[in-house]
């Protein structure tokens, strides 16, 4: 049963004070960021500190602690801080993909307000000046943050154009389509494309691009189709190799776990999400990831 903001604030304080990490994880898993963000404000007004600071004092350090601190901080403030980290020094391309591409216009504009408040800079201006412009991944990010999408009502024509861009290896045309097409029309374009040409868009992207360019283009494609597809793909990147990327998985989870509930099903093409969490990460983080992504370590997911 969902609690009121007041009752949830009280319950959160009780759990943090008890230093019960398992209970805190379970509570976190039950509420979306729109509810948790209200509690963050209420908690500060009542107890004089933010829940993230209280969590830092109560729990042992480590990626699980960081994840829970992020979860009980305003979601778009977290995005703003992660963006700033990604742009500090050498660009963290993976972080930029996670932070920028898995984001719709409303969240992006709200993030921008936090970014300006915290860093006294304009997020878009900083991003545009800090990343290069010659590589497809950076061109995609620069176009994506405009959030200027419109319906063209030319699905068949766009599908044909998409094939032309993919066959010729023309990143500019592909990026324009990704950045200017609504989610609804992208789904239709993808359907017509697959039916007409007998091949998946993702297959041609993967065969024409590599490394960061491929990861960025596939993330954008999957996000427009279904956020759960994008989250699953990004999780698969973090979970690749003999050891998982804890920093990336914490970042992905904090930004996406309540916005991509289909992730655990979409991940089946890459493996078993719960099993990978348990295998790749320390026990604390593994348990937290399984709870937040709603996967059963004993089951198929």
From Swiss-Prot:
Annexin repeat extents: 2-72, 74-146, 153-223, 225-294
GO molecular function, one term: calcium ion binding
Compartments, as annotated in UniProt: Cytoplasm, Cytoskeleton
Cellular component GO terms held in the UniProt record: cytoplasm; microtubule; plasma membrane
The entry's keywords: Annexin, Cytoplasm, Cytoskeleton, Microtubule, Repeat
InterPro entries associated with the record: Alpha_giardin (IPR008088), Annexin_repeat (IPR018502), Annexin_sf (IPR037104)
Principal subcellular localization: cytoplasm
GO biological process, one term: cytoskeleton organization
Primary role: Giardins are involved in parasite attachment to the intestinal mucosa and in the cytoskeletal disassembly and reassembly that marks the transition from infectious trophozoite to transmissible cyst. They may interact with other cytoskeletal proteins such as microtubules in the microribbons or crossbridges, to maintain the integrity of the ventral disk.
Family: Belongs to the annexin family. Giardin subunit alpha subfamily.
Protein name: Giardin subunit alpha-9
């Amino acid at each position: 049963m969902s609690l009121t903001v007041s009752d949830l604030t009280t319950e959160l304080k009780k759990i943090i004070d008890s230093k019960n990490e398992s209970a805190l994880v379970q509570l976190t898993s039950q509420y979306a960021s729109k509810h948790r963000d209200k509690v963050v404000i209420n908690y500060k007004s009542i107890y004089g500190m933010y829940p993230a600071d209280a969590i830092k004092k109560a729990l042992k350090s480590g990626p699980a602690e960081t994840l829970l601190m992020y979860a009980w901080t305003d979601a778009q403030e977290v995005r703003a801080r992660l963006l700033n980290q990604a742009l500090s020094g050498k660009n963290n391309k993976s972080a930029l993909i996670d932070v920028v591409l898995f984001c719709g216009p409303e969240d992006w504009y709200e993030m921008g307000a936090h970014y300006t408040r915290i860093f006294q800079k304009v997020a878009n201006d900083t991003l545009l000046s800090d990343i290069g412009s010659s590589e497809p991944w950076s061109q995609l990010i620069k176009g994506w943050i405009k959030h200027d999408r419109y319906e063209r009502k030319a699905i068949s024509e766009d599908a044909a154009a998409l094939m032309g861009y993919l066959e010729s290896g023309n990143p500019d045309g592909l990026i324009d389509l990704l950045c200017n097409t609504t989610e609804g029309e992208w789904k239709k374009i993808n359907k017509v494309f697959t039916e007409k040409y007998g091949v998946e868009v993702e297959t041609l992207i993967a065969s024409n691009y590599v490394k960061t360019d491929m990861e960025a283009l596939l993330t954008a494609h999957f996000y427009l189709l279904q956020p759960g597809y994008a989250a699953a793909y990004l999780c698969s990147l973090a979970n690749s190799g003999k050891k998982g990327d804890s920093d990336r998985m914490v970042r992905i989870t904090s930004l996406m776990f309540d916005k991509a509930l289909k992730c655990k099903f979409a991940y089946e093409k890459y493996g078993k999400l719960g099993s990978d969490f348990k295998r790749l990460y320390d026990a604390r983080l593994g348990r937290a990831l399984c709870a937040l992504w709603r996967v059963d370590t004993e089951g198929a997911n």
